[in-house]
Swiss-Prot record:
Name of the molecule in the record: 3-isopropylmalate dehydratase small subunit
Pfam family, any one: Aconitase_C
CC terms in the record's Gene Ontology section: 3-isopropylmalate dehydratase complex
Species: Buchnera aphidicola subsp. Diuraphis noxia
UniProt GO MF annotations: 3-isopropylmalate dehydratase activity
Amino acid sequence: MLKFIEHTGVVAPLDISNVDTDAIIPKQFLKGINKKGFGKFLFHDWRYLDSNQLKINNKFILNKKIYENASILLTKKNFGCGSSREHAVWSLLDYGFKVIVASSFSDIFYNNSFNNKLLLITLDEKKIDSIFDIVKKNLGINISINLLTNKVIINQKTFFFKLDEFRRVCFLNDIDHIDLTMNSLKKINVYENNIPFFLLNRKEFKSH
């Protein structure tokens, strides 16, 4: 993934609260561990009218042609609730979503998303309702997300959001926990070489 500074894309409105991970991707599709290929199972039971994916549910928002290239999902509170499954995040990313905007997310889904570089933007419910109003009156409209300024811009209106600074820096610089640890490797080695003997494990202590 490249550094995330700003993204502009079509926003798809999913006007549903408490979307759980089983709705995002049903349990029968969790067998693989490769992060690719899960997009076709995203919202499976809502997108299709049969288990074989032969009958499309034309009423579902993502099946409307105007949203076929949507990269931003707008939804309501408590998105990603239910059981912890990283596949839910993988399916959203593989489908093509880069950003999800909602009034709240489940804690586990929130952490899984950031660990996989899916950007989650939290706005209060009044702001979310305002954006829904704009989107419903302007089908297929774009939204711009700017991480340098912490702004959501749509239809010449600006909404400010807050994001944990650590996560923000990770997105802006395309780094993660491992990268940060590796950047401190010299300091870690110095510490380990100077650790007091009484903190060593039993095997290491005997060698001294």
